[in-house]
């Protein structure tokens, strides 16, 4: 329960900070709240009002995490090293190192998942630079793409490297440009 509160508090701060630095998004959020309040004017509509905001909040949190992490160095704990089998789908073998960034939580409430590209040996942990984000359009999770400092990959190579798992999801790739800008 305490972990859930901590995640909720972090997400609230991240959401609030993003709205403060993106006035167009803040305005969009205010318009959404007004529209929902007009549709659900009684106290009995409170649950529907809260639910109506959730997808917007999730999408803002995803954008905020992208803004926060793209181009940054992160410490990755690898829980599925290159060559290992998926814990549930044992026929799936990881062609890349896969892990998570401790204490950075994604929209699903779990620590942010990361594909580590450009490292051809299985590793247990790695400090890499986030070069891209895979936004799953039919799931609440995003997946981060990290690589060694100075190494980049074009979108088609990223797509090929993560296809073993991402083929099951509609997604788009947000890239860090070679100059380090989004």
Put a short name on every predicted segment.
Residues 2, 21, 101:
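A conserved hydrophobic position in a structured secondary element of the catalytic/binding core
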């Amino acid at each position: 329960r305490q972990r859930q509160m901590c995640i909720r508090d972090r997400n609230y701060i991240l959401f609030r900070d993003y709205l403060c630095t993106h006035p167009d998004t803040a305005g969009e959020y205010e318009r959404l709240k007004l529209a929902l309040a007009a549709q659900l004017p009684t106290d009995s509509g409170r649950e529907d009002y809260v639910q109506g905001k959730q997808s917007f909040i999730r999408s803002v949190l995803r954008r905020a995490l992208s803004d926060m992490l793209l181009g940054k160095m992160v410490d990755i704990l690898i829980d599925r090293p290159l060559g290992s089998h998926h814990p549930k789908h044992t026929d799936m073998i990881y062609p890349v190192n896969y892990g998570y960034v401790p204490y950075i939580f994604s929209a699903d409430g779990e620590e942010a998942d990361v594909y580590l590209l450009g490292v051809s040996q299985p590793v247990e942990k790695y400090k890499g630079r986030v070069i891209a984000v895979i936004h799953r359009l039919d799931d609440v999770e995003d997946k981060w793409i990290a690589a060694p400092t100075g190494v980049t990959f074009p979108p088609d190579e990223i797509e090929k490297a993560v296809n073993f798992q991402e083929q099951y999801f509609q997604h788009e790739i947000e890239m860090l440009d070679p100059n380090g800008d989004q």
